[in-house]
Structures are given as structure tokens and as C-alpha cells.
Amino acid sequence: MLIVISPAKTLDFQSPLATRRYTQPELLPQSAALIDLCRKLTPARISTLMGISDKLADLNAARFQAWQTPFTPDNARQAILAFKGDVYTGLAAETFSEAQFDFAQRHLRMLSGLYGVLRPLDLMQPYRLEMGIRLANPAGASLYHYWGTMLTDKLNQALAEQGDTLVINLASDEYFRAVQPARINGRVIKPVFLDEKNGQYKVISFNAKKARGMMSRCIITEALTQPEQLKAFDAGGYRFDAAASSDNEWVFKRLQQDG
């Protein structure tokens, strides 16, 4: 079973580390080439391209300039501990045991606009470069063109190393599009999390992101290996709804929360 999740814009390079072990990103040369492109962008262009404030644009221009290899524990941090958005709140990797980090390293992959695909213990330096932005590059008009089949190849490699053919897609559509799902050597199951609001069930972004992290955590901490085991997932009050699900899109619903 291979879990795929999105990165986060919110980063944490300050908190104490839950593990000292680390690995190097597998697509670092491609990341370095992207950094060379990004260093040519003015803060004003970054602001327009990413739809962010001047202050954030200045920060990310500085990050592009400061980015350097080799990555070491002194200038970089393990990806699973560096990302701190809603998904990662649900994942709570800072509480993992070493055995759980081992399981995650084999079974979890994080997609990234800059790094392509990251294993949990891969070091990364701070950045902001979302997969969906229109950054012209030698391969085409966007990062989807840039990464091409590389991300799919890496996921297929991870599946082959496991001897498995199951991908659990807990990433956003923006990021999973970069994977080219039709090229995956296996079955892709997409869990969908719906919250009741005023008598109707709908995707509430903040809640859905956190739920993706909670399901990732469940798979890792329980060392799940079979898809049917996922149907018992009940963290946060979600319950599997067989009637609303299809073969490869599994729906989990939660009753309206008080407050």
C-alpha cells in the first residue's frame, strides 16, 4: 500500500525533531534546475505568479536565493516534519516512533512542486512552489510539463519495491494530476471525506485535509496492508458509507459537529 499526499504551504523548521535519521530527495538535480529558473523571478513576478502578498513574495525570493546543496541536518529538515498544514496536523508525525517512521518511509510519498516526490525522511529546504502554477520551463508552460512522467515512475518504483499494486490517493486533485494516474501500475483508491452541514453532505476543505492526514496516520500507526482495512477508519467521527462509494472512490461521512 502506497499513500500519496500533498505538501503544505505552512512550514516548521523550528520544533524539536522526532527523529535524527534522514535521507536525500531522489530528484534533487531536477529541483536544482527549477531553483535556477526561480532565482530569475523578481519578487513582483513571484507575487503575480503565486497570487501572494509582496511580503510573502519577498520571503520566497529570499528562499530561492538561499537554497543550496548539499542538504544536511544543519540547513534542511525531514519533509514529514517540515510541512505543517492541515493534512500534517492530522498526520501528527512528530509523535511517531522510529518503527512508524520506518513504515512511513516505505509506504508514504509527498508530492511537491519543487521536489517532485518526497519520502518522509528526505531532507528539504523551505520553499513555496505549488504544482498548479504556470511556471514556464524548458519542458513546457507548467510544472506538470516539467515533471512529466518522473513522479509516476517514482511511485511505480515504490510499488515494485513493496511488491504491491495499491495506491491510496489522499492528495489534492491539483497534485495528483501530476502523477498521471493512468500510468500507475496498480489500483488507485481515492477516499473522499464529507461533512454534514445543514442536512447536506459536502467537502469542507479544512476538515477534508485534516481527515486525509488522519487516515494517513491510521495506515502508518496500525501498519495496514489491505484496502478493506480502511473501511474501519473512524478517526474524528468519520464513517465509511458503502452506498455512496464506488469501487475506487470511497466515501467517508461525518455528522454535523456541534460548535
UniProtKB/Swiss-Prot annotation:
- Mind naming one GO cellular-component term on file for this protein? cytosol
Top-rank taxon of the source lineage equals Bacteria
Biological processes, Gene Ontology terms: response to hydroperoxide
Its family?
Answer: Belongs to the UPF0246 family.
Q: What is this protein called?
A: UPF0246 protein SG0407
